[in-house]
Amino acid sequence: MAATGKPIVVVGGGMTGLAAAYYLRKFAGDAGIPARVTIVEASNRLGGKIETLRKDGFVIEKGPDSFLARKKAILELAADLGIDDELVPINPSGKKSYIVFRGKLHPMPDGLMLGIPTEIAPMLRTGLLSPLGKLRAGLDFVLPARKGGGDESIGAFLTRRLGREVVERIAEPLLAGIYAGDLDRLSLMATFPQFREAELRHGSLILGMRRAMRRRPAAGADGSPAARAGAEAEARSAASGNGAERSGAEPHAPSPADAILARFRGAPFLNFRRGLATIVEALERELAGADWRLGRRAVALRKGGAGDSGARYAVVLEDGEELAADAVIVTAPAWEAEKLLGDHVDCGMLRNVRYASVANVVLAFDKASFGREFHGSGFLVPRAEGRQITACTWTSSKWLHTSPPDKVLLRCYVGRAGDEDAVSLPDDQLVRLVRRDLEELIGVTAAPEMTEITRLHRSMPQYPVGHVEAMRDFRRRLAEALPGVWAAGAAFDGIGLPDCVRQARETAEAAIREWRDIAP
């Protein structure tokens, strides 16, 4: 790109920011618009929460561990980058998952979709619910739908439809785990709007989700937030009938993503053979001609370009440097976005997006001394169990590429909204607490050969009730106050990697459209 091209600044070097910068350069080139892209990242590394450790034959994800296969935005990006041949599916024999109840692992009942039962017999047989709890869940078939619109919490909605027992023992560990959140505070319409749609369309949440289950192959869910987030998106697409696979949708030519899905037919989640850092590294290579400001924090946005540049805006860095910009894409967390934009537009809704802190504790064992075989991919721990770990993925069982054949790799999750103290414990104490839970829950007494702890402070956005309307209003006022400035990322419209890529692409497209509209 020409150094004298139209200047654009992307604030944030995580998945959304890198993908936005990539698509800006791509779309600008396709449109014949010279563009000069600068990426500003406060830390000294790229990728945001994505970080892969490759060590001694292990491939260890320190952040997210996979992404939903059916959300095509990230597959299209992988194909564009030429890394789709590096994709790997989960182990087909490692899909079974469990829920802890009263200190014991219980198989997740068949027919669950996001914690919502779609088959009667498995729910009648499960030991997770009492007879009264099962009867209460059955009232969903006769209870009328709530009248009126408006948002409500996930917890309030599910309690109304299925009863508190189902919520606390089945739905909460699965759904709340996606956001490391509190179901009684998280927005229904920002997280699982398909639940409300099922209620309105079918008069029953169970019947609505049963139809969704029959339309799509079950995604399954294990202990990982990525798997839970993937299951959420899978069900959302199925229940709402969105996408080209919807009955009655017009046919379209197969895309690169369609070819990838055909290759991994039935695999709900994907990763890369050398870890998720593969896509970050590929984006960095493609952006070699961009300008970088690593370890430099953007602290202000000023109308009027830097110096005599004639640009619309100046992005001010903490060391005083000013970057001229005709367009700015802010992909930073909500509190950082508020600092940049708050002088120009009301950012109260960004202050309402609070963040939970979590930790990942990875333990590697020698298989010969481990003492047991795993048949499945992991387990979930309800909040009511009072454990330190919220979930555990049997990583070497779920992802065959992650460890040598003579080793066992486990990944445990600690921390959720309102229960985050353990995240900040010293390493030895945190490992001790995790090992205690593993011993009591699954009988693991062997000492790990290696541990790897990652603390992700303020990493999980908590969408409050009313989030969708608040963000729609915020974006409208942002466009009015600061034309050519956009905000995207996990704080706004979906926390999964595919959602971040989708937002990045949509924002880049909007920027190119605006440039065309205002071109003389």
Where are these regions (language model features)?
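Conserved flavin/dinucleotide-binding core of flavoenzymes
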Residues: P109-G111, P117, E373-G376, A391-P520
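Conserved Rossmann-like nucleotide-cofactor binding loop
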Residues: T16, R45, W335
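Feature captures the FAD/FMN-dependent oxidoreductase FAD-binding
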Residues: A73-D110, R161-E168, E286-L294, V299-Y313
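Dinucleotide-binding Rossmann-like beta1-alpha1 core, especially the glycine-rich loop
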Residues: D56-A145
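Mid-domain catalytic core of redox enzymes
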Residues: P225-A227, G241, L294-L410, A417-S424, ...
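Beta1/beta-strand and adjacent pyrophosphate-binding region of the FAD-binding site
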Residues: A2-T16
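Active-site/ligand-binding neighborhood in enzyme catalytic cores
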Residues: I116, I120, K134-A300
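Glycine-rich FAD pyrophosphate-binding loop
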Residues: R25-K55
